Regions:
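Class I SAM-dependent methyltransferase Rossmann-like catalytic core
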Residues: 1-48
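Short glycine-dipeptide loop
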Residues: 72-74, 152-157
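Conserved SAM-binding loop of SAM-dependent methyltransferases across substrates and taxa
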Residues: 59-72
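Class I S-adenosyl-L-methionine
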Residues: 165-210
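A short glycine-rich, Lys/Arg-flanked "PGG" loop and its adjoining helix->strand segment in the class I
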Residues: 67, 138-154
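Conserved class I S-adenosyl-L-methionine
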Residues: 48-58
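Glycine/threonine-rich flexible loop motifs
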Residues: 126-137
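S-adenosyl-L-methionine
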Residues: 79-127
Length: 210
């Protein structure tokens, strides 16, 4: 019974959410689109001609924004384990980038195996156990950072969802050693009660392999 009540509460909040309503009116696939739009307005990451990788992309809200801003000269590659409906200007790869086949598919889709920007709005399925949920969230952020190190051109950027808690400061310290600038943003479309923030890491210094 408690689970049903919780689901009804979530559904009511979702339906009445002004960002959800706005996304439906303006044709975006999710309320998350507005988070990336705000971040891009502040940092100017999505420029025409850029190559963008979107991790955990389904249902496609971030890929949709990215494709509209990098224009026809750019490229957006969306990866997710889940099925994602096609989007104009987006190459969708249903795969796990932790596995060799998924990583190979991504690299094959990238010009010269390199990207200008890596996006990650990935979040774990919430169990309700805060310690476990935080550990899973930070593990996803670590994976996004590792992937970014592998594919970003020198000077590239990374935007990744983080949650304040265990592992946050360690992740930030690592990112600051790899990028010239790392800032934390909480877009207006993020729920006020959520610990969710986004790290915006710019001007990648380059991996040792470069």
């Amino acid at each position: 019974m408690a689970k049903k009540r919780g689901k009804r509460t979530w559904m009511t909040r979702h339906v009445n959410d002004p960002w959800v309503q706005r996304s439906q009116q303006e044709g975006y696939r999710s309320r998350a689109s507005y988070k990336l739009l705000e971040i891009d307005e502040r940092h100017g990451l999505l420029r025409p001609g850029r190559v963008v990788v979107d991790l955990g992309a389904a249902p496609g809200g971030w890929s949709q924004v990215a494709a509209s801003r990098v224009a026809s000269g750019g490229r957006v590659i969306a990866l997710d384990l889940l099925t994602m409906e096609p989007l104009e200007g987006v190459r969708v790869i249903q795969a796990d980038f932790e596995e060799e086949a998924g990583l190979d598919a991504l690299l094959a889709a990238l010009p010269d195996g390199r990207a200008d920007l890596v996006l990650s709005d990935m979040a774990p399925n919430i169990s309700g156990v805060k310690v476990a949920d935080q550990a899973r969230a930070m593990a996803l952020a670590e994976l996004a950072l590792e992937l970014a190190i592998s594919v970003l051109r020198p000077g590239g950027a990374l935007v990744v969802k983080l949650f304040h808690g265990a592992g946050f400061e360690s992740w930030m310290a690592t990112a600051r050693s790899l990028f010239e600038s790392v800032r934390v943003r909480k877009p207006e479309a993020s729920r006020a009660e959520s610990r969710e923030v986004y790290a915006v890491a710019e001007r990648f210094r380059g991996s040792t392999a470069d």
